[in-house]
Amino acid sequence: MTESNNPLPISEKIGVLLVNLGTPDAPNAKALRRYLGQFLSDQRVIELPAVFWQIILRGIILPFRAPRSARAYQKIWTNEGSPLAAITKKQAQGLQKRMPNITVDYAMRYGTPSISSRLEKLIASGCRRILLAPLYPQYSAASTATVQDEAYRYLQKIRWQPNLRSLEPYYTHPAYIQTLKKNIEDQIKALDFKPDSLLLSYHGMPVKTRELGDPYYFQCQATSQALSSLLDIPVITSFQSRFGSQKWFTPATDMTLKELPSKNIRNLAVAMPGFSADCLETLEEIALQGKSTFLEAGGENFAALRCLNDSEESLAMLEILVNQGLSGWLKSGE
C-alpha cells in the first residue's frame, strides 16, 4: 500500500454529535407531511404492524394532521427557522467553544440535518471516536433507542467504523438537577406573581411501553422527585402530547390544567424538564394552548418556563456530561 492511499489518519480526533428529535424544514403542510411521515413511520414510535399502520398513516392521519401541525408551527416559527433546530445548533456551537480539542456537531433524528450526514462529516474530518449524545435526560425506546438505531444503520454501510459510544441518560445526574433547579428558581423569581404550584410536564407515552419494560415513566418520576426535594414550592407531575386511542400515562397535562383551578391552584408555573430545548411541545402546546386551557378553567396567572436551551448553565452542564461520556478517551488536561 502506498503512502497516498494509506487510510490511517495522522491523528485520531474525537467527535461529539448532539441529537434531538427533529423538526420540519418549513411551517407548511408539504414539509409537515414529509416530516411527520418519517417520524410516525418509525416503529420505535408507533409499535404497530407496518403495513397496517402505513395505510392509516398515509390515508387518514397525514392528510389531516399535516395542515393542523403546520398552523401550530407557524405560531412559533422565527427568523432563524424552527426554534428546536436553532437552539440545538447554538448548543453545539457553545459546547464547541468550551471544548476546542474535540469536534462538536448536531443532528436531528427526523428531518435535517440527519444523523447519517453528520456522522459521515465527522468521520471524514478524521474522527475515529464519536460520542453520540441524545439530548433526552430520560431514556425511552421511542427517543434514545431510535437515535442509536439510526446511527448503527449508517455504520452498517461503511467498512471502517469508528468507535461509537452513547451518552447515558442523565435524569438524576447532579449537574442536570442543579441546573434545572437554578433555571426554574431564577424564572420564578422574575415573575410578577407567586405560583401556588409548579407543574412538571413531560412528554407522554402509551402505558403499554411501561408494561413492556421501558424505564421512561419511572425516570420522569425520579427527576420530579429529585427536583421537588430541592425546590421550595409544591410540585405536580403530568404527561403531555397524547396521540391516538391507546391509554397513555396519567395524569394528562391538559386535564390537569383544567382541574387545578377547582383545587384552588390559580397561579401556576409550568416547567418541562424532559425537553432540552424549547420546541413545538413547549412553545405552542404548553405556552399557548396550555395557558388558554388553564385560564378558561378559572386560573388567574400562568407562566410557561423556558427550557435549559443554550444558556451558560446549560452549556456547563452539557460539558460535564460529555466529559464523563468521553472518560478514557480524553488525555489529561483536555
UniProtKB/Swiss-Prot annotation:
GO cellular component, one term: cytoplasm
Pathway given in the UniProt record: Porphyrin-containing compound metabolism; protoheme biosynthesis; protoheme from protoporphyrin-IX: step 1/1
The entry's keywords: Cytoplasm, Heme biosynthesis, Iron, Lyase, Metal-binding, Porphyrin biosynthesis
One Gene Ontology term from the biological process aspect of the record: heme biosynthetic process
Location within or outside the cell: Cytoplasm
Record's keyword annotation contains Cytoplasm: yes
InterPro entries recorded: Ferrochelatase, Ferrochelatase_AS, Ferrochelatase_C, Ferrochelatase_N
Catalysed reactions, as listed in the record: heme b + 2 H(+) = protoporphyrin IX + Fe(2+)
Family: Belongs to the ferrochelatase family.
Function: Catalyzes the ferrous insertion into protoporphyrin IX.
Descriptive protein name: Ferrochelatase
Originating species: Zymomonas mobilis subsp. mobilis (strain ATCC 31821 / ZM4 / CP4)
Name of the gene: hemH
